[in-house]
């Protein structure tokens, strides 16, 4: 039996329902309405997901979480939207809690000798409530899985675990929380660059000193992870995806992905699986939860999420001191760079036979790290630019190369990969312009496309 405890939330979800098609005897039924539902969140959600695999000892707050007061447990709110045969989160609406101080969290937890204890530390008070901690972490020797959120590496619980259980502690955190903590880790350039940045931060950033002698799993979006185990570092990655890709492509947002990762990871750990398999299962479960969303009830689709690990997820050992030249493709014995290059040129890219990181920008495909980082940098600029509804200036990019090198093709494919529905391609051959009026006419075409609500990459 696994014990799960930690910060508990009550997660309210609401979704709209159409009014009656026929005129109802009650006026309110003729108008758009909303339904609401309270779900167990935080540690209770992690426990519920783990029950899909094994027996779980967890806190109890009663049968009706919606009847709890915000002074007792933090309440969160999210508005859903229909997507397919279920729902995704349209908007996270915020939280409510006690007017001052910490929530009281009046839950009960049965004492049980568990080989594994999972602590969901969301930074909402549990870390300071020693009276709520399971007695095993005070005097026993269990394996402890700590799912920690910002603010990181603070509080009585963290200090206690570092002092009493460093050898039996596995910490699960996110790259975004590390960035918020001050770690300069680039986002969405290449898997190699992310890994190199992480290694540098672990070696040089004093705020991460506590992690250097621990076993740490850093979740990189929903697409990858890094396992840092007392200096031995492994990177887990989806070869065709980069950090944030799944979130960008999903029909909406989703909550509970961190709990899904932790539950799948811990379940595999309890089965005696190797760390690689545990992490792969965690990545797979979190990604599937985002893809599936809430079920039609709506509720968490637990039976649809926890399956075998995605066999496309690659794993590679990160060198101790990478210096900007390291590539996954050059990591023996996984890859022979010459054979891999020859295979791609002759046969094209095959996920099964060649699990290299590959970037897809529309019809443009590249497996070269430098090209990936260059294209991703430009694409990131485009994404940020298109988030601005009323930019004052155009985004200007200079592309150089001989005729026929694919300059226009590369730019158009990059733009199309950002938001194909809003992109309207406009190509102008300046060498054919006869006078200044031709240039003015080109600018007018760009203006007209903008007035239509489109984003026109004007290639001159």
Regions found by a protein language model. Give the residues of each.
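Hydrophobic positions in the central parallel beta-sheet of the AAA+
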Residues: 117, 426-428, 458-460
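Short helix/loop segment immediately N-terminal to the Walker
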Residues: 382-395, 454-456
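Mobile, glycine-rich extracellular loop/lid and propeptide segments
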Residues: 413
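Extended, charged/polar low-complexity intrinsically disordered regions
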Residues: 1-389
